[in-house]
């Protein structure tokens, strides 16, 4: 799977499904579930490492976990899902040269075929343009951008007319820069629909309704493994309770044996 395949999926109106993964087990499960894309996201800071935000994740963390995820794949190379790695906080906000160096390390050192960059501010636009010119495919990410939570919080974006116009303009710019797809996070459904209809590249929604060309979810949220669920992700099972109850049953039975 290559980034260009996702663009072809949009042309064919084929829905794109993506999940996050953080180790070989979650990577293997995602592959066996037949997802199109596996995102090694900086959300692993909270899912795996116990942090309260995504900001502490380092470049070394992303490389380590991306390689772990890829080792879980068992299908032929051409049948494996596309792997996209997040660019951690301050690996692309620090200038074009450093961003190219850090993104290059991800692509060289892992099986990732693209990186994801949050935001579309003028400085970020320059970074994205440079990365793409250097041969590194980029997935954009607008709407709620968790790496900016210290400034904007974690609230829904695009609820005012000015915010909607800003997000629409950002989506158009990201396509012009050459992004192969864009994540739309926590924005109104109809705004996502308008953006989806205006672009030739696919939109991947998380908390952006069902009009997007695809959906991505944090696997731990979907499986109910976290105590705090985002408002836009309804778990399909209460995994934490299920695993806890089953493990407690085993512990109790072993103590009595």
Swiss-Prot record:
Cofactors, names only: Mg(2+)
Its EC number(s): 2.1.2.11
Keywords, comma-separated and alphabetical: Cytoplasm, Magnesium, Metal-binding, Pantothenate biosynthesis, Transferase
Pathway named in the protein's UniProt entry: Cofactor biosynthesis; (R)-pantothenate biosynthesis; (R)-pantoate from 3-methyl-2-oxobutanoate: step 1/2
Active site: 185 (proton acceptor)
Main localization category: cytoplasm
Subcellular location: Cytoplasm
GO biological process: pantothenate biosynthetic process
Gene3D superfamilies: Phosphoenolpyruvate-binding domains
Molecular function terms, GO-annotated: 3-methyl-2-oxobutanoate hydroxymethyltransferase activity; magnesium ion binding
Cofactor annotation remark: Binds 1 Mg(2+) ion per subunit.
GO cellular component: cytoplasm
A Pfam family annotated for this UniProt entry: Pantoate_transf
Function: Catalyzes the reversible reaction in which hydroxymethyl group from 5,10-methylenetetrahydrofolate is transferred onto alpha-ketoisovalerate to form ketopantoate.
PANTHER family named in the record: 3-METHYL-2-OXOBUTANOATE HYDROXYMETHYLTRANSFERASE (PTHR20881:SF0)
Oligomer status and interactors: Homodecamer; pentamer of dimers.
Family statement drawn from the similarity comment of this UniProt entry: Belongs to the PanB family.
Protein name listed in UniProt: 3-methyl-2-oxobutanoate hydroxymethyltransferase
Lineage: Bacteria, Bacillati, Cyanobacteriota, Cyanophyceae, Synechococcales
Gene name in the database record: panB
């Amino acid at each position: 799977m290559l980034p260009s395949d996702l663009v072809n999926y949009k042309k064919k109106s084929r829905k794109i499904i993506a999940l996050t993964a953080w180790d070989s087990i979650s990577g293997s499960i995602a592959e066996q579930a037949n997802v199109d894309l596996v995102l090694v996201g900086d959300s692993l800071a909270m899912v795996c490492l116990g942090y309260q935000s995504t900001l502490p994740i380092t470049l070394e963390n992303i490389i380590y976990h991306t390689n772990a995820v890829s080792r879980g794949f068992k299908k032929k190379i051409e049948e494996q899902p596309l792997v996209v790695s997040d660019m951690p906080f301050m690996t692309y906000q620090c200038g074009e040269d450093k961003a190219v160096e850090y993104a290059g390390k991800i692509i060289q050192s892992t099986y990732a075929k693209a990186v994801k960059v949050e935001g579309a501010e003028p400085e970020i636009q320059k970074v994205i343009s440079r990365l793409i010119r250097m041969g590194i495919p980029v997935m954009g990410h607008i709407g709620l951008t968790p790496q900016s939570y210290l400034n904007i919080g974690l609230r829904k974006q695009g609820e005012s007319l000015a915010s909607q116009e800003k997000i629409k303009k950002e989506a158009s710019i990201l396509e012009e820069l050459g992004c192969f797809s864009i994540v739309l996070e926590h924005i109104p459904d109809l705004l996502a629909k308008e953006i989806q209809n205006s672009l030739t590249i696919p939109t991947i929604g998380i908390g952006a309704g069902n009009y997007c060309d695809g959906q991505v979810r944090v696997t731990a949220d979907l499986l109910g493994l976290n105590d705090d669920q985002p408002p836009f992700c309804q778990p399909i099972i209460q995994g934490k309770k299920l695993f806890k109850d089953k493990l407690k049953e085993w512990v109790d039975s072993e103590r009595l044996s």
